[in-house]
Amino acid sequence: PLSHGHKVAIGTLAMLAFYEKFLNRDLSSLDVDAAVAAWPQWPAVEVNIRSTFDGALADHAVAETQVKYAEPEELRARLTRVIDGWEDTRTALTRQLVPARDFADQLRRAGAPSRPEDIGLTAADVRATFPKAMYYRSRYTVLDLAREAGWYDELVNEVFSLDGLWT
C-alpha cells in the first residue's frame, strides 16, 4: 500500500498548483449574480456526489457536503463576504503558500516523491481525487470557493494542462 505521507506530498503539490491558479484570477470581478444563477440545487449536487462515490462512502460524502452547501441567497452572502475581504485574504495566502514548483523541488531534494509516477499513480489519478477531496469533508476549502465562483472545472483543467505542474 501507498504511504500516507507520500500521498499527502502529491496531494499537497496538486493543491498548491490549484491555489496558484485560483490566486491568479481576480475574484473581485466575479459576477456574483451569474454565479448564484448557475449554482446547482442540492438534489443535483447529491446526484453528482453519488456518481463519485459508492455505498457508505457516498452516504458520508453527502452528509459532509450538505453541511457546507449554501442555498442561493446564502451563496450570494458568502461570495460577497469573501470578495469584500479578498485583497487581505489573497495577500495572506500569497505570503503563506510555497509555490508548487518550489515545493516539488524541495521534495525531490529530500528524496521524497514529487510526481504522481513516483508513487505509481498518473496525473489523471490525482485529478480524479479533486471532487472526492471537495465532497468528503465538511470543511470549506478553495475547491468549494472555486466551485461556487463557477471556476472549479477551468482551474482543474489548468492544473492538469500540458503546461501544468506535471508536464
Annotate each PLM feature.
Residues P1-L23:
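A conserved active-site cap/scaffold subdomain adjacent to cofactor or substrate pockets
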Residues R25-T167:
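C-terminal charged capping/lid subdomain of soluble metabolic enzymes
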